[in-house]
Design a protein with these regions (language model features):
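Extracytoplasmic
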Residues: 77-109, 122-125, 284-289
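Helix-breaking motifs and short loop linkers at transmembrane-helix boundaries and internal kinks
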Residues: 101, 153-159, 297, 329, ...
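Conserved MFS/SLC helix-loop-helix module at the cytosolic interface between two early adjacent transmembrane helices
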Residues: 120-158
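Helix-to-loop junctions at the C-terminal end of transmembrane segments
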Residues: 122-133, 317-329
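Paired small-residue
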Residues: 147, 158-167, 356-364
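Helix-loop-helix hairpin linking two adjacent transmembrane segments in secondary transporters
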Residues: 157-159, 188-242, 287, 291
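Cytoplasmic helix-loop-helix junction between adjacent transmembrane helices
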Residues: 163-201
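C-terminal transmembrane helical hairpin of 12-TM major facilitator-type secondary transporters
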Residues: 331-368
Length: 368
């Protein structure tokens, strides 16, 4: 219910401003029925304008919605580049093995080298927290560019291993810093949705990036997908510099203070869910082709279309879960979606011989 005191104070202030305004109307020979005399115009004059160029600090909302959208798009470009860098190996591994004169098993170590880089690079975030998130993101984007260029030009297997390790270093740290930036860019009602938009680049990489990289490798060269990732990383560097506003560093709680949250059980549960989820994704990537071709009866040449459908499920699930988490409890949304995934997996196990049904259930699983 409106406060009567505030309402009467506002009315007195408005009556105090009216004589001066009427004098100005008389001087300019403006009639009382002029649009400038309408209630909407008076309200606009009474509303103070928000200063431009406001720095984004903790707890401060971004006034201009365009700044928020551009910032989130720039962050999503970064996750798109990382998604392509990570998953590009799945479709071009045989081509790399032939190009470098190595076995498939040796080529598989290139995936492990990237994973080791991810594990080594993520802790760097603990020593870089005193800097602005924008500055950290720029450094990480430069590392993404360096790793992609080295992968594209590596002449030997040893150099390719080192290049994949370097390419993996910014992965974990980027997701951590970009999540902080996305939360600080959004208002209180849309923080979860902002993070889902940032992560959407990873799912888009599965939808378009992986099939495109496979086609480029098969028709031109396995080095072309890495050139594409390098160009994308260059765009990420530019868009972060151009579109992401300045964000103040997080408060310094000391080195030990950064790990105080681990005393709670919630972070460990989230870590376990993340480990199991990522492990499941890589198992799915490893065995989806024999499942769909041997059990589902699909021809091998249709696998690229099935992968596009799976990527579409990831995009829809990512964006939908973000919106639902803004409205309901994130824990409740996660529990419901995982229950649907478990049911779909059990149906795939029992009904794998029905190809199109299995394909539809596969999309449901990737959406979850």
């Amino acid at each position: 219910m409106p406060n009567p005191t505030a309402r009467h104070s506002a009315a007195r202030g408005q009556r105090g401003q009216e004589p001066a305004f009427r004098i100005q109307l008389h001087k300019n020979k403006i009639k009382p029925n002029h649009p400038a005399c309408s209630p909407q115009a008076r309200a606009a004059r009474a509303t103070p304008s928000r200063p431009r160029g406001t720095r984004v600090t903790a707890g401060t909302d971004v006034a201009n919605i365009k700044i928020m959208k551009k910032g989130l798009i720039a962050l999503a470009f970064g996750t798109l580049a990382l998604g392509m860098t990570e998953f590009v190996m799945m479709g071009i591994l045989p081509d790399i093995a032939r190009g470098l004169g190595i076995t498939i098993i040796q080529a598989g170590h290139l995936i492990s080298a990237y994973a080791i880089g991810v594990c080594c690079g993520a802790p760097l975030l603990t020593v870089a927290h005193k800097y602005s998130p924008k500055r950290i993101l720029l450094v990480l984007a430069a590392m993404m560019l360096l790793g992609a260029v080295l992968c594209a030009v590596s002449p030997t297997y040893g150099m390719m291993l080192a290049a994949r390790f370097i390419a993996g270093l910014p992965h974990g740290a980027y997701f951590g810093v970009a999540s902080i930036a996305a939360i600080r860019l959004a208002d209180e009602r849309h923080k979860t949705g902002a993070v889902s938009i940032m992560v959407a680049g990873m799912t888009i990489a599965n939808l378009f990036g992986v099939p495109l990289s496979t086609a480029l490798s098969g028709n031109i060269s396995w080095r072309v997908p890495f050139v594409l990732v390098a160009l994308l990383s260059l765009l990420v560097l530019y868009y972060i510099w151009k579109w992401v506003p300045h964000i103040d560093p997080l408060p310094d709680n000391g080195y030990k203070g950064q790990f105080r949250f681990l005393r709670s059980s919630a972070p460990w549960l989230i870590l376990a869910a993340t480990m199991l989820g990522n492990g499941g994704i890589f198992c799915w990537y490893s065995y989806v082709t024999p499942l769909m071709t041997t059990e589902g009866g699909f021809p091998p040449e249709t696998m690229s279309l099935l992968m596009v459908a799976a990527g579409f499920g990831m995009v829809v699930g990512n964006l939908t879960s973000g919106r639902l988490s803004d409205r309901y409890s994130p824990g409740r949304v996660a529990a419901c979606t995982q229950a649907v995934v478990v049911a779909a997996l059990l149906l795939i196990f029992a009904l794998a011989q029905y190809g199109w049904l299995t394909a539809g259930l596969m999309v449901v699983c990737t959406a979850g």
